[in-house]
């Protein structure tokens, strides 16, 4: 009989538990764990006996392999219900969705690998592939045959615990921002892909755990078909935070995709000035420059000094994609030139913007087709293009990444779908 220091959870599940006298305490139903120190550490056991569920902790518990038969032997049992725990393995993890942080995807837990570390049992890995499922249901030979037929290696897919994030919320006292801190380290586009694979409850929990900036960046990356359901489930506070960190051009795009309660919820949470600006953006026809322009840009007067400009930028703390170009305008907001951030930082602080600006600037009319903005961005290698009205007054900019995200990418996706 061999004592096991590493084993799979489903191998011990529903097995008899014996006390030191050889009597059966019951069958293992579930295991309580806490993640206070990282890896889920076993702190208690649910045992089923005669239709009743009992709760135990053991002074000593060992798992043995007796010629292929699993035995669980214990000493010093006491009935106790853990007051604080993070998960029940069967109820909250087994067969549930979990996020593979490295693979940046949602996977299903088919088994859990448990190891004895410093005298305590801990979950060290998640088994997520089909191999674990075949083995668990006792059809491993059938699985091997299938894999051989499709010429794939029959290998376990084990994800180490530090590389996964559970979606279950058991401890309601746990801060949401702490609960999903691994997910928050991912790129917004990867988080968006993960959210799209979750059900609405899980999606709401994860999204509300993100900080304000990350939530806004992630929301921008989410496919339009999911945005309405997210807005619908968000609290009023979180909705207001989200909108506050979104550009009005993005809000206008969002409103075009929403209707009914979801649309009203957005409008109610907008400040008056923002609502007016969004309404103005919504008037533009699709595929015109105005429909994808943003009103967030930096515009300063001809006589503002370099030193004053730098102080203004520090106070504004603008997004990096709008601070690269500073547009120089006259008293009537007509564009007279542009200052690149690099030139600003390398110039004498006492001179005016008019002395270092490039006055040969390319602009595009707000009613022009988006294709014209694309052409000018490519021809002059611009990160953003100034948008002017019929009086040549600066009213917005078109960012190159908005051209890609809101115009070129949807066209590419539509073409590939067909």
Where are these regions (language model features)?
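Hydrophobic packing positions in regular secondary-structure scaffolds
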Residues: 66-70, 77-84, 88, 92-100, ...
């Amino acid at each position: 009989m061999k004592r096991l220091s590493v084993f799979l959870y489903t191998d011990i599940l529903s097995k008899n538990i014996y006390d030191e006298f050889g009597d059966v305490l019951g069958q293992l139903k579930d295991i309580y764990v806490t993640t206070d120190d990282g890896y889920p550490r076993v702190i208690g056991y649910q045992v089923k006996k005669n239709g009743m569920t009992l709760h135990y902790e053991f002074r000593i518990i060992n798992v043995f392999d007796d010629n292929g038969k699993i035995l669980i032997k214990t000493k010093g049992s006491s009935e106790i219900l853990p007051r604080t725990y993070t998960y029940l393995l069967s109820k909250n993890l087994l067969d549930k969705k979990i996020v593979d942080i490295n693979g940046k995807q949602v996977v299903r837990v088919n088994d859990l690998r448990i190891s004895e570390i410093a005298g305590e049992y801990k979950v060290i890995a998640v088994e997520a592939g089909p191999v674990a499922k075949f083995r668990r249901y006792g059809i491993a030979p059938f699985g091997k045959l299938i894999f051989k037929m499709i010429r794939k290696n029959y290998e376990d897919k084990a994800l180490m615990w530090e590389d996964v994030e559970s979606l279950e919320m058991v401890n309601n006292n746990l801060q949401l921002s702490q609960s999903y801190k691994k997910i928050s380290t991912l790129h917004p586009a990867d988080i968006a892909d993960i959210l799209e694979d979750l059900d609405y409850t899980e999606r709401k929990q994860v999204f509300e755990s993100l900080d304000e900036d990350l939530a806004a960046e992630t929301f921008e990356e989410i496919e339009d078909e999911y945005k309405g359901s997210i807005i619908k489930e968000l609290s009023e506070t979180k909705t207001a935070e989200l909108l506050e960190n979104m550009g009005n051009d993005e809000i206008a795009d969002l409103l075009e995709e929403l209707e009914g309660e979801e649309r009203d919820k957005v409008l109610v949470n907008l400040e008056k000035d923002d609502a007016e600006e969004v309404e103005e953006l919504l008037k533009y026809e699709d595929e015109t420059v105005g429909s994808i322009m943003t009103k967030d840009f930096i515009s300063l007067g001809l006589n503002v000094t370099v030193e004053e400009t730098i102080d203004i930028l520090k106070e504004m703390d603008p997004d990096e994609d709008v601070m690269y170009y500073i547009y120089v305008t006259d008293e009537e907001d007509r564009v007279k030139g542009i200052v690149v951030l690099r030139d600003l930082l390398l110039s004498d602080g006492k001179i005016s913007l008019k002395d270092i600006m490039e006055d040969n600037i390319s602009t595009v009319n707000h009613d022009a087709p988006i294709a014209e903005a694309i052409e000018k961005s490519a021809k002059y290698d611009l990160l953003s293009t100034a948008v002017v009205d019929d009086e040549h007054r600066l009213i917005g900019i078109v960012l190159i990444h908005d051209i890609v995200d809101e115009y070129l990418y949807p066209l590419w996706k539509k073409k590939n779908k067909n």
